[in-house]
Design a protein with these regions (language model features):
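Alpha-helical scaffold segments
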Residues: 1-242
């Protein structure tokens, strides 16, 4: 994800891009954005831009400062606290942002999830980073969890981790069970078979796709009810004899 392109300004520049001074009071949004496209911009210049209250009214400028490879860490972290929810999402997805800054943006976003609207959570579930989508798999609203399963950044490992959580909601288990892509993965099926919320009919179907040598281990660690386990064990024995 990249910051919106801004056409270069025709007005005279108020900056000395590689000098020791910067008249940040005269900096306009277009000039600042043009300057921040320079990958070799000095950290001191970026910090001066970040101290201009007029410039910081522009979300594009804030995002450009945070995403610049030479922005001092303390400047980026301070600006993160000023961002709106979906701007935090954008920072977490910026390929040019430092890893620790992206993680800080994710942390800030995750901390806000309980206070954002259902509509915002639905949008975040599909569009956010994999780490945020993982948290939204555990949302109390089934629609949010279902939407998170469509996130292109969500991985098999994150889904298995969510399913293995003792507090995994029934609606998450059911959504994964019926998801065309994820329910076909063998490791995900194994995780589903360890959940007490998997429907017995699907448990029987999925167990047949699991290699015989690992079925017993899955049943031993499964949280399924005792009668369901017994039924699957009998099915397993029957399959082995057959």
């Amino acid at each position: 994800m990249t910051i919106d392109e801004i056409p270069p300004t025709d007005s005279p520049s108020s900056f000395e891009t590689h000098g020791d001074t910067l008249d940040s009071e005269l900096a306009g949004e277009d000039q600042a954005l043009s300057l921040l496209k320079q990958t070799d911009l000095r950290a001191q210049t970026i910090e001066e831009l970040s101290k201009n209250p007029a410039l910081l009214k522009s979300r594009k400028v804030k995002l450009a400062i945070i995403g610049h490879p030479r922005t001092p860490r303390h400047v980026s972290l301070a600006l993160l606290r000023q961002l709106f929810t979906f701007d935090l999402m954008q920072v977490a997805l910026l390929p040019v942002a430092a890893g620790d800054i992206k993680k800080a943006a994710e942390d800030a976003l995750i901390n806000r999830l309980e206070s954002v609207t259902l509509g915002e959570r639905l949008s975040l579930a599909r569009r956010s980073s994999g780490r945020v989508a993982f948290v939204l798999l555990c949302d109390k609203e089934s629609r949010v969890a279902t939407e998170a399963l469509e996130n292109p950044r969500l991985t098999e490992g994150l889904i298995i981790r969510a399913l293995n959580d003792d507090d995994a909601a029934p609606h998450l288990v059911h959504a994964v069970c019926h998801h065309l892509k994820w329910s076909a993965r063998r490791e995900i099926r194994a995780a589903l078979l360890r959940s007490e919320h998997i429907p017995l009919s699907l448990a029987v179907e999925f167990m047949r796709e699991i290699p015989t040598e690992v079925r017993d281990e899955i049943l031993r660690s499964s949280r399924l009810a005792a009668d369901a386990k017994a039924y699957l064990q009998n099915e397993n024995l029957s399959a082995s004899r057959g």
